[in-house]
Each structure stands twice: as C-alpha cells, then as structure tokens.
Amino acid sequence: MDQGYGGYGAWSAGPANTQGAYGTGVASWQGYENYNYYGAQNTSVTTGATYSYGPASWEAAKANDGGLAAGAPAMHMASYGPEPCTDNSDSLIAKINQRLDMMSKEGGRGGSGGGGEGIQDRESSFRFQPFESYDSRPCLPEHNPYRPSYSYDYEFDLGSDRNGSFGGQYSECRDPARERGSLDGFMRGRGQGRFQDRSNPGTFMRSDPFVPPAASSEPLSTPWNELNYVGGRGLGGPSPSRPPPSLFSQSMAPDYGVMGMQGAGGYDSTMPYGCGRSQPRMRDRDRPKRRGFDRFGPDGTGRKRKQFQLYEEPDTKLARVDSEGDFSENDDAAGDFRSGDEEFKGEDELCDSGRQRGEKEDEDEDVKKRREKQRRRDRTRDRAADRIQFACSVCKFRSFDDEEIQKHLQSKFHKETLRFISTKLPDKTVEFLQEYIVNRNKKIEKRRQELMEKETAKPKPDPFKGIGQEHFFKKIEAAHCLACDMLIPAQPQLLQRHLHSVDHNHNRRLAAEQFKKTSLHVAKSVLNNRHIVKMLEKYLKGEDPFTSETVDPEMEGDDNLGGEDKKETPEEVAADVLAEVITAAVRAVDGEGAPAPESSGEPAEDEGPTDTAEAGSDPQAEQLLEEQVPCGTAHEKGVPKARSEAAEAGNGAETMAAEAESAQTRVAPAPAAADAEVEQTDAESKDAVPTE
C-alpha cells in the first residue's frame, strides 16, 4: 500500500499531544489515521496505542503498552488505502467468508491467537483488535478526495470459525448489549451517508441459505464503518437505551444514537457478530432499511423494498416486513375488499349524484322561469320609466333631470352628432329631428307633472340595506367612463388623471367615431316610424306638426327605433270601434249628429272610391260628415291607438251614419229599432275587424 495510514487513531492517557490532537489531559485523540482536521498531518503519534497498516498486511504485534504497534505481519490481506481500486461493499458476511477462505488457503497465518490478544487488549484499554480489511470494491477511476477517512470498512478477524466465535475462545462476546451496539452502530453508519456500491458480484462467494445473491448480505457491514467513526463503539458501546456492557469500559467516544431513530438498535436477539443471521425475525426487522442509500440518504432508507423481498421470504415474512412502512399482503387483501366496498359506494354515490343533478336541473328550470318572469316585469317597469325619462334618441342620452337634458341639447357633442347626420341626410330632415327631440321632451315633462300630481314619489329602495360594517362597504360617487368601460371614483385628482391619460384619449376618439356612425342608424330608424313620417311630411310642407300632435310616436311604438308600432290585439280594436259606433248611434238618435269615426282628416283616400260614392249619394250625409270633422278630431285626441283601425272600419260606420240620417226624418223611432241598429252595427264592426 503506497499511502498507508500510520495509525487509525491514537488514545493517550497522558498530556502528550501532537499538533492537531483532540483534547488534552486524560485522553487525547489524534484524528483518524493521524489526519488532523485543523492542521497538518502528523504521522509520528506519541500515544499509548497505534494502529498501523503495512503495504499489504495488518501488523498486529503487541507493544509494551498493550497497544497494537507495527510488527511482523500477522496475516496477508489486500491493501487498504486511498488507492483508485476502492469499493466498500456493505456485506459483512461475504467479507467474513472471503477472509476465512483466504486464511484457510494461507494456513491461518496470524491466527486467532493474535486476535484473542487483540480482543483482550481491546477489552482492557478500549482498543481495536487486529482485523483484516478485505477490499472487494471494483476499480474506480480514482479515490474521492472528499470522502472522509472514516468511511472505509475495517473488519475484525473472526478466525476460522464460521459462526463468528473468534476461534471458540470468546464465545462470551455474544452479548446482547454488544449485538445491539453493533446494530446501533449499523444504523448510525447508514445514516451518515457512508454508503458504497454493492454491485460487485464477486463479493458473494459462499452459498449461505440465509443470504440471497444481492439482498440480505448488505445491512450488517456498516457497523464496522461505525467502528471507524466512534473508535470501537459499534461493538458493544453504550447507548442511551441500555446500561454499558460488562466486558468493556465506558466508551470515551460520544454516543450519537441512531440519527434520531430511537430504539432501532434494541433488537432482543443473541445473534453472533454478523455470522449466519439465523434469526428470521432479525432478518425481517432490518430488511426494510436495506437499499436506496446512494439516492435517499438518512431519511430515505428502504423506500423501495419489494424488489429484494421476492428472493427468499415467505408470504408471512413479507407481510411482517412490509408492516413497518407499507401495507402487508393481508392489508392489501383487506384493501382489495375495502376497495370493492368503496366501488359499490362510489356507484351509489354516482346514482345519488345523478338524481341530485336531475333535481338540480328541475330547480334550474324553475329558476330560469322565475328569472324570465322577473325580466318581463323589469322590462315593463323600465318601459314605464322610459315614458317619464328625458331622452335624446340620436345621442342615446337619457336622464331624469330636466336640466341635464337641456344641457345636452345645447352641448357640443349633440351638435357635432347632428352635424355628422346632416352629411348623410338632408338639412331639413336634421332640423326636424332636432325639433322633434325638443318637443318630445316637453311632452315627457308634462307627463311627469301629471304623474307627480296623481302619485306621490315613492322612496327608492336602499341597495345597501342589510350590508353591515363587517363587509367594509362604503358608498361613494363614481364616474363611469363609457369609452374605457371603467368606474372612476368622483375625486378631482382621479378624474383629471384619467381624463389626461393616453388610453382615455385614444379610446374616446375611437368611441366618438363609432358613436357617430351609430347615431346615423338611429336617426334613420326614428325617421322610419310611420307617424314620424307623416309629421316630417307636414314639416317639409311648412306646417307645424307638433302643435296638433299630442301622441309620442316613439312611446306609442314602445320606444322602439325600428320603425314598428306597437300592435293592439283584435279584441282591443273591436272594443274601440264598438264604442265609437255606439256613440254615433246614440247621437244620431238624439239628433246631435253622428261623429265621423275616421282617425284622420283623409278617410276617403284610405277607404277607396266606394266609400266616397256611398257618402256622396246623400247631400245630407255629406253635410253631416262635414259637421262631424271637429268631433272626429277631438275623438282622435282621446283615442289615439284606434286611429287606423277605425279608419278601416269606416265603411260600416258610414252606412250606419246614413241610416241615422234617414232616421232623423222619421217620427219618434221606437227603442227597439234603435237596439236593432246597435246590434247591426256591432255585427258590422266584428266583420270589419278581420279585414284589418
């Protein structure tokens, strides 16, 4: 061995100490193999006992002070040093078998006698007995310089006896405490990260029925690592869970426990030092901590256990091993039964969930129906609110405040919108739109006043009612920027910041262009309303259509801008026509003259030439019709919605009027005749309704 260590460690009871020695006084520690962790190495150890390596042997000659000094080679062994060929196998039994085979071939040089003296020496002065370190590691590229020196395995020479009795002399060493100490050290060694590759198949040279090829020969090798680490504490040193052994003095090395794993070394077994491992219970209990060291470290031992358990263990042992961390086979079977029950439960839950989904769907349908009804009610309420809300149709501006609508009509935005519309429509039409919007808002103002006189203002519901202070709500005023679709608190600095922001200016320009295009479509839609068309024709003729027009066409058409009026049901039309006919008949009977049922001053144009000829056949009827024009106008103001329907029913009404004219020449007509006329008029009105 080229770079043999001058000594594994030195204990001294005197004050003599070399550089880097640990402690002074009763005992001093000269590092591992004279390696000083805080200074230079010192190979000249002046201590009571030294452990030396020869080039290829362990020199175990007894020195004067009872230590193991360098002497004649006791046995041949493979060199153990920081050579490139280093592989520390974790198999103690395989190493022992290797050494026994080598010793039998070499004649047992340095036999068990030297070992016995070493044991006695060790028992008296807490020193290592002579042992052989068999290096079974495969050749590595080079020694890891960062590997601590205590990571090498040095095994005791157990002699030629396979059961580890040290030549039969030291069978008393089968101390349970020492065995527990070795296992304790094994656990600590495994937790320190001193783990080597166990992939060399040549390590296993003996066919042990308890040792599978690569599984159960691993765990009891690292106790010898622990010997290197704590100076012999691994074989019988004291631990917190038991008194010190009777054969050894108190250990001077610190007891590190089991890296926080208490009780892991307290196996109640009298197993010899790593030989045979004949107790299945012992093998079962330490099996889970067997593999995965290179990857898992101290916390991850034994995560994947079932790969190595398939070699040797019966089912009961496998179940007992797995019970420490994983489920046993019995547990797995129980888990299978449980999983089956869980599957049935899952099916029941699925059925229940399906029924719940069906119920939820029914509830959703009911909720949808209720919501639809609520929407209709809200729509009706909004429609009623629109009838009393000031509005500018082309600008889509609405307000309940008269001052706001007046400001809007005089605003730059409104004027620019009308100017843009004037580029697409005639100027006269745009002027009519402006006049129409102004007069419409005047009518809304009158309607609002009438409602205020009839009904008192209802208090608005407080939306914050029921919201406590624990919700941290606060009522504030805010501005809604339609261009940016953003709510800004009504604070001057925030509003000004938003008004001068780049995004707002960009968005408002885009919104203005889009708004102008939309306003053109709205203006065309308003002008398509047939009532407004008539008003526009009058306006273009120079007449004032707003003085005699008391009906708001937009409101009559449900404020729709699509040019369609709100149609009434046939029953409503029939009722209106019937009321007009009855009134005309009563007036004819009383001699007051029947009012014309036409809804406008141009009934002849709509009714056709037949009506005109029929009306012109009697001069008295013509005179009566002329007298009835003002009454018809007044009735038009009172019943605006039945205007067109009454015009369509004018044919039957004129016939009734002619009959009323002829009735005036009669003397005191009987009431029965009047009733017959009323019934006839009712039948005619019903016939006139389907012709709509």
Swiss-Prot record:
Could you describe the post-translational modifications of this protein? Phosphorylated on tyrosine residues probably by SRC subfamily protein kinases; multiple phosphorylation is leading to dissociation from nuclear structures implicated in chromatin structural changes.
The record's family statement is: Belongs to the AKAP95 family.
Task: Outline the segment boundaries, as ranges, of region: Interaction with DDX5.
Answer: 109-201
Q: In which tissues is it expressed?
A: Highly expressed in heart, liver, skeletal muscle, kidney and pancreas. Expressed in mature dendritic cells.
**Lineage per the UniProt record:** Eukaryota, Metazoa, Chordata, Craniata, Vertebrata
Q: What is the effect of changing residue 481 to S?
A: Abolishes chromosome-condensation activity and recruitment of condensin complex
Residues where Phosphoserine is found:
112, 199, 323, 328, 339, 662, 685
Q: What is the effect of changing residue 484 to S?
A: Abolishes chromosome-condensation activity and recruitment of condensin complex
Per the record, which residues fall in region Involved in chromatin-binding? 387-450
Q: Where is this region: Interaction with DPY30?
A: 1-210
Biased composition (Acidic residues) is annotated at: 324-334, 551-562
Q: Does the keyword S-adenosyl-L-methionine apply?
A: no
| Record protein name field | A-kinase anchor protein 8
